[in-house]
Amino acid sequence: MIFLRIEHTIPSGLLENRRVRVLVVGAGGTGSAVVMGLPYLDQAMRAWGHRGGLDVSVMDADVVTETNCIRQPFSISDIGLNKATVLINRINMFWGTQWKAFPIHLDKRVQTRGNESSPDIVIGCVDTRAARVAIESAVRTTFNMTMYWLDVGNNAASGQYVLGQPLNARNHRKAERLRTVSELYPETLREQRHPPPVPADSECVAGWHSGKSQPPRLTSFSRALPR
């Protein structure tokens, strides 16, 4: 096996006295966890002397459903509201930020609008082939000044987080460029994810509402990890 050592340097644009633009695509289980942690990173950056901090936008067209209230940070009062809007409103009220929510999908129609400047960092928290393809297309074309694409994903038995530099107007082809998820794991763009080997949220809700059985125990979902 051949190992390639790469020395990577953070682009100077992220160290300037301006806000670092971050776009999070997906506000579900993974996306909501990522978004709720970004205010702490923003505070840490400012504490260490970065004058701009983060300017975060969240994009997701889905609304909160009853099943989302089991494994995602939403409550019954959020049902019917847009996920991205709920999360951003909550963060802005608590932290005093002015972050933005876009209750839309990242598709070709959005990419051709051209009314938003390229984010410095795109964080993909999606679980479908179509969504990853849309992100890859965006960071190569419309968002052609994006520095990094961080992909966070999982399937039934594994997961990954990959920080890459998409080939675009800012990132050119060179040996030290960080490869993206589409280059390292092309199957994530070619194949659909398999459902996790645990009962779906809807099944849990149905069982609780039927009154025929006790709520499922979490221990029944556990799996031994390989050594």
Feature roles, as predicted:
Residues 52-96:
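Glycine-rich phosphate-binding loop and adjoining beta1-alpha1-beta2 segment
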Residues 122-125, 151:
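Redox-cofactor binding/interface segments in oxidoreductases and associated redox assembly factors
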Residues 2-30, 34, 129-227:
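Glycine-rich phosphate/adenylate-binding loop
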Residues 18-49, 57-65:
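Glycine-rich adenosine-cofactor-binding loop
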Residues 80-119, 126-133:
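A structured beta-alpha segment of the ubiquitous adenosine-cofactor-binding alpha/beta core
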Residues 41, 74-75, 139-142:
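Glycine-rich, phosphate-binding/catalytic loops in enzymes
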Residues 19, 53, 119:
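Phosphate-coordination loops involved in phosphoryl transfer and adenosine-cofactor binding
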Residues 55, 98-100, 148:
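Conserved beta-strand segments of alpha/beta enzyme cores
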